[in-house]
């Protein structure tokens, strides 16, 4: 099942990017640097409104550049919420991708690779994100404390099944699942290696390089579409050169080693008995229509190196 991959597959490819489209006229928060290719423009929509971003953007970074700060509503009181993180730890910017049978709810905008024609919608609001009628819950906060439904809706008993429970169920949850079967294809497979490296930041890249140079079979898995971890977002210097250059060189060497497989867009979600690990790989945007949209891998590894990094807790929650 394995195939050879080049370093270009882990860098912004501008799949579906419009080279002739004008640059976004008003992106007050657009900053320089990073892996964003500002020479090419991608059109996408959020809640039906058209915006522009660039190859290398995530949905979150493109919305931020376009001065879109409100991305969601809190679960219970429907208070306005924006970004507080940049990766899979983001709790607020949960969106629905696509429409109809192809829609995917509860997707973190910080993990969505921007692609031409991307359609995203906010969740947990009615009738719109900016004017959410259920924000009235915030005014009722004193009587909607934790576990209020176990005390408030006890009488009359006949109302529970017919009235109270349907109302609570409608208010609960965030995104909505598609009600019909999708035409998208999912697949599964098995992989075997000597060393599984989880995370392709600086530590993960070095671990994969060290093991790969030793001649053992290596799988390097990273949840992001651009391996490099924090080096992609910092002005770091390695060996008197920008860290992004070191990442490119490391990926190029790994791609040249036949005993190494680099898997971007792949989340290792569990470690099980006898060296078995579960991983979910997502397809890159713009791939063949008959290709699997996602693949579940069962990985058998003799050893695992966990290089998942760390996430600082925001001071507001310390």
Where are these regions (language model features)?
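Residue-level recognition of oxygen-bearing side chains
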Residues: 58-59, 203, 267
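FAD-binding core/adjacent interface of flavoenzyme oxidoreductases
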Residues: 79-82, 122-198, 244-318
């Amino acid at each position: 099942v394995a195939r050879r991959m080049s370093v270009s597959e882990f860098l912004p490819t501008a799949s579906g990017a419009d080279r002739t489209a004008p640059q976004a006229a008003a992106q007050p928060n657009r900053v320089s640097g990073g892996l964003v290719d500002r020479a090419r423009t991608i059109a996408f929509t959020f809640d039906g409104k058209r915006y522009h971003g660039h190859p290398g953007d995530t949905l979150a970074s493109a919305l931020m550049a376009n001065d879109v700060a409100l991305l969601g509503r809190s679960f219970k009181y429907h208070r306005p919420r924006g970004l507080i993180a940049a990766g899979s730890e983001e709790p607020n910017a949960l969106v629905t991708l696509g429409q109809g049978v192809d829609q995917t709810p509860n997707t973190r905008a910080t993990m969505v690779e921007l692609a031409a024609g991307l359609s995203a919608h906010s969740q947990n609001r009615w009738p719109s994100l900016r004017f959410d009628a259920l924000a009235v819950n915030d005014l009722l906060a004193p009587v909607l404390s934790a576990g209020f439904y176990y005390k408030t809706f006890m009488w009359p008993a006949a109302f529970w099944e017919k009235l109270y429970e349907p109302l609570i169920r409608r208010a609960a949850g965030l995104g909505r699942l598609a009600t019909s079967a999708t035409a998208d294809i999912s697949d599964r497979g098995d992989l075997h290696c000597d060393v599984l490296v989880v995370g392709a930041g600086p530590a993960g890249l070095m671990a994969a390089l060290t093991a790969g140079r030793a001649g053992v079979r290596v799988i390097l898995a990273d949840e992001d579409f651009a391996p490099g971890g924090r080096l992609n977002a910092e002005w770091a210097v390695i060996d008197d050169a920008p860290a992004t250059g070191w990442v490119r060189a490391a990926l190029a060497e790994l791609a040249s080693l036949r005993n190494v497989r680099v898997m971007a867009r792949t989340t290792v979600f569990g470690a099980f008995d006898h060296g078995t690990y579960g991983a979910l790989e997502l397809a890159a945007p713009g791939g063949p229509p008959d290709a699997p949209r996602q693949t579940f891998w069962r990985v058998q590894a003799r050893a695992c190196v966990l290089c998942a990094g760390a996430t600082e807790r925001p001071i507001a929650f310390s």
